[in-house]
């Protein structure tokens, strides 16, 4: 027999960085622990420069004092349902499940957002938004997180996020940019200038270490990610970001 509990670390309660504690607890109690029900909801195209942290805190944005951070006891109720947060949550969960040799397995139970009579209070009433694609089959950013871990046949690179083309912030404040890929290394360029090569390591977070702090210029910015495959071929992804 296989045991698969519901563990909603970082959604209905707690923080997603407490996931390992829950996993360790059930591994001791059950020899065949498979986890299939976890995650959270997100709106396609909703983004924030400051997603709730892995510790379950609303974080400051450089110009605020860190002391004003506040805890979020139930992110499902008071969170912003941004794609950024759910990407981080899934990334953390997969990082643990893929690297824990005592973990029997993992599956994603909701591939697509779906209608339900049980969710009249949701931002989109009667729709459960825990899927990796929306009702029109448009992939959310979380789709590419899973693809980076579970697809080893089709090389790809995806700059987070193609639905986040307008960003803002104080001049000189670097912004985080992640690239999700199943290739071994990525080089990221900003307006044709290399920001360095990083190697993928699933023990690293976020994006298996494929993360850069980018100093956007005012106006249009062109981000280019170039991945190298095992065969030496190059895979490219490009994104235009308007920064103000």
Question: Locations of the language-model features?
Answer:
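Edge beta-strands of extracellular beta-sandwich domains
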Residues: 232-243
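A short, sequence-level motif marking secondary-structure junctions
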Residues: 201-203, 242-243
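Extended substrate-binding grooves/exosites of carbohydrate-active enzymes
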Residues: 1-202, 209-218, 222, 226-231
């Amino acid at each position: 027999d296989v045991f698969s509990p519901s563990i909603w670390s970082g959604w209905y309660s707690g923080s997603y960085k407490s996931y390992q504690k829950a996993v360790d607890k059930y591994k001791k109690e059950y020899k065949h622990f498979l986890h299939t029900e976890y995650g959270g909801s997100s709106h396609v195209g909703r983004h924030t420069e400051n997603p709730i942290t892995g510790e379950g805190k609303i974080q400051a944005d450089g110009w605020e004092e860190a002391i004003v951070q506040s805890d979020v006891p139930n992110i499902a109720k008071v969170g912003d349902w941004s794609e950024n947060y759910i990407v981080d949550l899934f990334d953390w969960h997969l990082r643990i499940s893929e690297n824990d040799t005592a973990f029997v397995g993992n599956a994603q139970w909701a591939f697509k957002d779906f209608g339900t009579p049980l969710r009249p209070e949701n931002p989109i009433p009667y729709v459960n938004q825990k899927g990796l694609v929306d009702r029109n089959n448009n992939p959310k950013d979380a789709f590419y997180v899973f693809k980076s871990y579970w697809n080893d046949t089709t090389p790809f690179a995806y700059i987070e996020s193609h639905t986040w083309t307008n960003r803002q912030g104080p001049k000189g404040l670097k912004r985080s940019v992640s690239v999700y890929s199943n290739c071994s290394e990525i080089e990221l360029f900003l307006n044709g200038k290399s920001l360095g090569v990083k190697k993928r390591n699933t023990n690293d977070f976020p994006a298996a270490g494929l993360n850069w702090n980018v100093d956007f210029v005012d106006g249009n910015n062109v981000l280019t990610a170039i991945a190298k495959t095992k065969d030496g071929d190059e895979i490219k992804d490009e994104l235009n970001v308007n920064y103000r």
